[in-house]
Amino acid sequence: MAGHSKWANIKHKKAAADAKRGKIWTRLIKEITVAARLGGGDVDSNPRLRLAIDKGTDANMPKDNIQRAIQRGVGGLEGAHYEEIRYEGYGISGAAIIVDCMTDNRTRTVAEVRHAFDKHGGNMGTQGSVAFMFDHVGQFIFAPGTPEDKLMDAALEAGAEDVVTNDDGSIEVLCPPNDFAKVKAALEGAGFKAELAEVIMKPQTEVEFTGDDAAKMQKLLDALENLDDVQEVYTNAVIGE
């Protein structure tokens, strides 16, 4: 099954992450801390914590930082108490945007998110206003040139729900979020290492932006991504090259 071009977006996302690795670490420390607080410090019984630690390892985060974050989460060390908040809104031409945050100050966070929307031509929506346009899924992106038939066999055997070959040759594997850790381990055991592996809010349909609208939309997304309390930004907008 064919899909949109993903590879350029994946490379852009990885380059952006490399450029602000310190910020990525801060976000991952929050995620590890909250995952440990909610589900305990044992990765075998806490798949969310396992995923967060895997992301930390992939981002070259020192093991000491990871362990301290776990200890803070389970109460072994003092630290800020973070809560998870989701905001929803609209960008240029009504594009749907979800903003997932972790914060120790809800008032500050909502003001900053609202300001970013307002400044860049978007607007905040109410809870549930756009979330229904997205599916909660595990996603793996494999580089162009990955053996499609072998990957499909391994993915479906591992419990994946769908395997999508994109226009640019990259391959996308989707699975239920609760099966993410199992599918990831099975794929890696079969010799397939994803360029990007995460649990996301995936848009059911996408809207492509080009020209000035693409530039405006990218500025809004960047403004939201750059807020300290923001963990993830999801959108149904595809920014054309």
UniProtKB/Swiss-Prot annotation:
GO biological process, one term: regulation of DNA-templated transcription
GO molecular function terms listed in the Swiss-Prot or TrEMBL record: DNA binding
GO CC term (a single one): cytosol
InterPro entries: Integrase-like_N, TACO1_YebC-like_2nd/3rd_dom, TACO1_YebC_N, Transcrip_reg_TACO1-like, Transcrip_reg_TACO1-like_dom3, YebC-like
A Pfam family reported for this protein in Swiss-Prot or TrEMBL: Transcrip_reg
Superkingdom in the source lineage: Bacteria
Keywords (A to Z) from UniProt: Cytoplasm, DNA-binding, Transcription, Transcription regulation
Subcellular location: Cytoplasm
Similarity remark: Belongs to the TACO1 family.
NCBIfam families noted in UniProt: PRK00110.1 (NF001030), PRK12378.1 (NF009044), YebC/PmpR family DNA-binding transcriptional regulator (TIGR01033)
Protein name: Probable transcriptional regulatory protein RSc2190
Native species: Ralstonia nicotianae (strain ATCC BAA-1114 / GMI1000)
Lineage start: Bacteria, Pseudomonadati, Pseudomonadota, Betaproteobacteria, Burkholderiales
